[in-house]
Amino acid sequence: MKTLQAMGIPYNPDFNGAHQFGVGFMQHTIDWKTRRRSSAVDAFLAPVMSDPLLTVETEATVTSIRMDRDRAIGVDCIRKGSRKSASAGEIILAAGAYQTPKLLMISGVGPDDELTKHNIQKKVVLPGVGKNLQDHYECPVVATTKGAFGYYGADRGWPMIKAGLQYLMFKTGPVSTTGVETCAFYDPDGNNDRPTIQMFCVPTVYLDRDVMGTEPGDGVTINSLLLRPRARGSVTLASSDPFENPIVDTQIFGHPDDLRPTIAGFRFARTVLEASPMRELINKEIFPGADVTSDEALAAHCKRTVKTGYHPVGTCKMGQDSDPEAVLDTSLRVRGTRGLRVVDASLMPTIVSGNTNAAVMAAAGKAAGLILA
């Protein structure tokens, strides 16, 4: 944070406030009093678990939505090897941007060609199901540090015991955090009213996918994440088997305008490592290496190491009647059906320029009002 502020990036105490531009502490779903994770389950489900009107079935896989022509009347599932069915006046899907379109398609709601290809009985032909996939994608720059300034090694041996005791006694230390503590939102082209890059810092050598030649150790990893991708991917069926995962075509860098800001974001992350006071802590850049400087070399690095930011959205998008690929109406009802809604990240027409957690909770809150109306 101090380095970015020295570079002219202002401190921002609330990325969800009036302005997104700036550097600040990551906003987490952590209860600051107990220093424990406070998820949607804690906030919304736990308080009503004893309600006799609520039944929660875990370890269950929904195999299909039961349809009577165009009306959804229930779901079939398998739980611990046993087949079960549940019926309701309205069915609400919340399986996420990958599984919700899969469930719709294996139940006969989706693009004509997909249903025909997998010999699925057509209930409602809806071309937009599985289209419009968007995500945030990130690329890393990694450097070793001159000392043990981060969290490397805190998950084993005496450091792990020490971290556990520190948390139990004081609710501080590595166990009280996600490990991603600071981030910044900015635009490489200077349009900071509308940031296009989110940059976040992990205080260790961190790569959560196989990248040859880089070992964990004391260091720092800065990831640059593209907030407004232009490319659109898709989710299609591998088969009609409900237990088989769908085919996810991300189309990362499938639009020519996506690679340039990603490279610009990477270059900026590298300048952070080279600026004071950060540079006093840095030993050397180890990935991709200080000799990787040309646009061509950086493009190759980004294409090789790019990974998901775990924010997939858009595959059952909400839209106007005039949009042929709109899956949901403005009340989140699946077009062409009755008694069927979608309430998850797949409803977003365009991905939000930040983490999707709060946006999905906000959409769910709005959906609750629509359902009860």
Language model segments and positions:
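Glycine-rich nucleotide phosphate-binding loop and flanking beta-alpha elements
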Residues: 63-64, 98-100, 324, 349
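Active-site acidic short loop of glycosyltransferases
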Residues: 51, 87-89, 337
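FAD-dependent oxidoreductase catalytic-site/capping-region signature
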Residues: 1-28, 146, 164-359, 367-373
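Short loop/edge segments at beta-strand edges and connector loops
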Residues: 58-60, 124-126, 320
